[in-house]
Amino acid sequence: MNNQDIYINLLNILSKEDIKVDEPMKKHISFRVGGPADILVRPRTEEQLKNVLKLVKEESIPYLIIGNGSNILIKDGGIRGVVIELADNFNSYEINDTRMTAQSGALLSVLGKALQKQELKGFEFASGIPGTLGGALAMNAGAYGGEMKDIVKSVRLMDMEGNIFELSNEQMEFGYRKSIISKNGYIALSAELELQEGNYDEIKSLMDDLATRRITKQPLNFASAGSTFKRPTGYFAGKLIEETGLRGLTLRGAQVSEKHCGFVVNQGEASAKDILDLIYVIKSAVYAKFGVMLEEEVKILGED
């Protein structure tokens, strides 16, 4: 099935404005790089999502599911097939007592503010993470001593057959930057979070403190995908990179952040290749000096 046929079939599922052809992926990921997606779709209901999945499966069309693109790098050749975006088109939430139920496309920052307003604590660590709930669940996102596994009660998921089911916290198999979602290719639809009653001023104070620490220590004024590398056992990636003498190293439009060596940033005009080449230089130099092979935390996708 060619792209024109795929588009025609998608029009039976989605409205025209929710289907984009040859869509530049740099508009959809935080690194602000990446070639075009053949087709990008934005389903607004679980039924639409189910029908899109049915189409790509039956026709063997390659597909990729993204949130707000804060932890991925799309190569300059772009993405073949269909990109399914679950972001502000899939972001409702509600709060009952000490529990929040939210769709996977909801931004963590938005959820954090809503919980603060309701004087519910436990989510502060995640409130400044630049991503969606779905992405945070998939990788068990964490910061400042907290992880998603600490607050998740249950998650509603969809498999590639369109089956919808619910898993408990234990069944989610949360680990360091992983979960059953990343393991089995499930799609997070929504999650129920368990919080605790707190004090508005104390919650706000902690959130403000964490925000200040991020602003002070992280290069938020440049496009990036957050921490570029996972933490190697017994080490800190940023410290290894700094001690290798790479702080500020620039390769065309990509740079090892001056503020935090664990971040590779786009100075404005970088290509995906610039970033990937710099990542290779970093990994090679750190391995040569310390014998430690860094592993990317950012997901690298697409074609050269």
Curated annotation (Swiss-Prot):
The active site is at 177, 227 (proton donor), 297. GO terms for molecular function: FAD binding; UDP-N-acetylmuramate dehydrogenase activity. Residues 32-198 form the FAD-binding PCMH-type domain. Its EC number is 1.3.1.98. Its main location: cytoplasm. It is an enzyme of class 1 (oxidoreductase). One of its GO terms (cellular component) is cytosol. This is UDP-N-acetylenolpyruvoylglucosamine reductase. It catalyses: UDP-N-acetyl-alpha-D-muramate + NADP(+) = UDP-N-acetyl-3-O-(1-carboxyvinyl)-alpha-D-glucosamine + NADPH + H(+). It comes from the Bacteria. InterPro entries: FAD-bd_PCMH, FAD-bd_PCMH-like_sf, FAD-bd_PCMH_sub1, FAD-bd_PCMH_sub2, MurB, MurB_C, MurB_C_sf, Oxid_FAD_bind_N. It is found in: Cytoplasm. Its cofactor is FAD.
